[in-house]
Amino acid sequence: MINFPTGMYEWSMLASQLTAEKTIRFQRFLRRFRLAYCFDGMKLHFLDQNTIDGYDALFSVFLSYSSYELLLSSISTYYDDASIKEDRTKYSILNPGIAERLKRDAKLEEFLHLEDKNHPLTQQVDRFFNSNDADILPLLEAIKDKVKHGFFSIGGMKPDSKEHSKDIWDGSRELLVMTEDIFHNFVLCES
C-alpha cells in the first residue's frame, strides 16, 4: 500500500489475532509512519528559504524518529519485554558521507550539546562528534529530543549550509527506511 510500510498484508493477518491494546499501539506507529513518510516540508511565509529548509529537516527527523520509537514500543508491548524499546544499541544508520559533513557543523554540535554530561545521549553525541563513528542514529535522536522538548528554533542551530539541512533531511529518510525494515521483519517473523 502506498505510504504504509512494507508488510501491511502480513500485519493485517497478525492484527486480527492481537488484543486491542497491542493493536492500538501498532496503529499509532502506522499513523506516525505514514505522516513521516508523506511529510514534504512546511509552508511558511516571511522566512528565507534556508530557514525553512532547516525547520523542514528538523521536523522530518522528529516525525521519523518518533515513528521509530513507536514501533519499538509496540514490539516491546507485543512481546511484553520492556528491554526492546530501551535497547536501541542494536540498530544503527551508517552513512560516512553524511556523518563527515555534519561533524564539520560547529553550530549543530553546539545545538545538540546537553547540559547533563552523564546522560547517555550526551555521551553518544560527544562520541559522534569526536570520533570516526559514522552512525548517525544518535545524532537523529538528539535532534528529535531538542525538537520534542521545545528547542525547536532553527535560529539556535541554523545549519552552516543548505547541504547540512539536506543531510539532516536525508538522515531522517534513512531512519524511515530502517524503521520500515524493522516492521517488515517483525510481521514476517510473527505471521
Task: Provide a role label for each language-model segment.
Residues 69, 151-152:
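Short, flexible loop/turn elements at secondary-structure junctions
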Residues 30-36, 53-78, 176:
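Short, hydrophobic, well-ordered secondary-structure elements
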Residues 1-58:
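Charged alpha-helical initiation segments
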Residues 72, 147-148:
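Hydrophobic side chains within alpha-helical segments
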Residues 79-135, 142-143, 150:
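Flexible secondary-structure boundary motifs
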Residues 41-48, 76, 152-159:
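Short, flexible helix-adjacent loops and helix caps
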Residues 17, 21-24, 49-63, 68, ...:
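Conserved aromatic-histidine-acidic binding/catalytic patches
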Residues 134-147, 154-191:
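Amphipathic, Lys/Arg-enriched alpha-helical patches that create a basic surface
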